[in-house]
């Protein structure tokens, strides 16, 4: 029986701790922060942190259907560079509380949950955002809406869709596969977005947050929350965020992989933003959608030198 609480009328599930024991390459002490949100009341967010407490802050946001485990190869590299690297789990993922109903997940709620984590609970300032997949869909909104909190931005295989441009066929295949799957094989989905082969133990680590289907409302909800038409509930806010990013001069390093058909079209859009102009933007070669798996240390080195330049 899952550990269940009710917050603001929302049923929240919590993954038992023993699911997270002895995960390969992930021996960071778990930390928790509580946020109070209008949507769900008190929600516990899990995160890991590495590096000196007084170092420049890098906030690493994962996406669908992963969790902070995705950043295990990057955290030590960033920490060794003197950076305070913080990787939270989105609500519904990892060690964070999981609203049990797909309908409890909205784009706006995810932006608010991460805002409350980063700014209310941890009071982070002069942050460099690193966002991949939904980590960028959420994180770029935070940068646009709270620019005073950010020193730099590193979008990696991500974007800010408004529904005004079409999504690639490969994305629709993923969307439909998630919608139709009776059992959502999280480890398989992560593997399908990697060039390197994950070990069985690594795949199991991606399955760890979800003991059964009941826990998977987050991964089930996310594809349908991406704005794909101009009348999507998040379109207006994302258009406003894009307009804001078009006026902000916060330094931006666009760090995409060479083999991600899902997000490749967003790279030129981001590189045209004022914060990205006149900068050498790295390409992480031999890496798929989950470039943290395929080229994590290389991406971390690029981020560290970018942070040093700020």
Provide a role label for each language-model segment:
Residues 251-287:
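Conserved loop-alpha-helix segment in the C-terminal half of the alpha/beta-hydrolase fold
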Residues 162-222, 226, 230-234, 239:
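Helix-rich cap/lid subdomain of alpha/beta-hydrolase
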């Amino acid at each position: 029986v899952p550990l269940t609480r009710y917050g603001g009328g929302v049923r929240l599930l919590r993954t038992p701790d023993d699911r997270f024991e002895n995960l390969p390459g992930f021996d960071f002490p778990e930390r928790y922060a509580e946020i109070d949100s209008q949507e769900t009341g008190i929600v516990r967010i899990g995160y890991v942190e590495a590096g000196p407490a007084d170092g420049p802050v890098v906030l690493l946001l994962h996406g669908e259907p992963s969790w902070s485990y995705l950043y295990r190869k990057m955290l030590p590299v960033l920490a060794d560079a003197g950076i305070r690297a913080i990787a939270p789990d989105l609500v519904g993922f990892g060690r964070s509380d999981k609203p049990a109903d797909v309908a409890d997940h909205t784009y706006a709620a995810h932006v608010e949950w991460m805002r409350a984590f980063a700014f209310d609970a941890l009071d982070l300032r002069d942050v460099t955002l690193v966002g991949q997949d939904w980590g960028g869909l959420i994180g770029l909104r935070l940068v646009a809406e709270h620019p005073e909190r950010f020193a730099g931005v590193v979008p990696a295989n991500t974007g800010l869709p408004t529904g005004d441009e079409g999504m690639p066929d490969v994305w629709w295949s993923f969307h439909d596969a998630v919608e139709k799957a009776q059992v959502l094989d999280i480890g398989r989905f992560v593997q399908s977005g990697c060039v390197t082969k994950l070990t069985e133990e690594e795949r199991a680590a991606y399955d760890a947050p979800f003991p059964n289907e009941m826990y998977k409302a987050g991964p089930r909800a996310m594809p349908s929350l991406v704005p794909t038409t101009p009348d999507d509930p998040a379109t207006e806010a994302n258009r406003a965020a894009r307009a804001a990013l078009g006026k902000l001069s916060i330094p931006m390093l666009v760090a995409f992989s060479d083999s991600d058909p899902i997000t490749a079209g967003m790279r030129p859009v981001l590189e045209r933003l004022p914060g990205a102009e006149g900068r050498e933007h790295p390409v992480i070669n031999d890496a798929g959608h989950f470039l943290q798996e395929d080229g994590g240390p290389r991406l971390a080195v690029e981020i560290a030198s970018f942070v040093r330049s700020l």
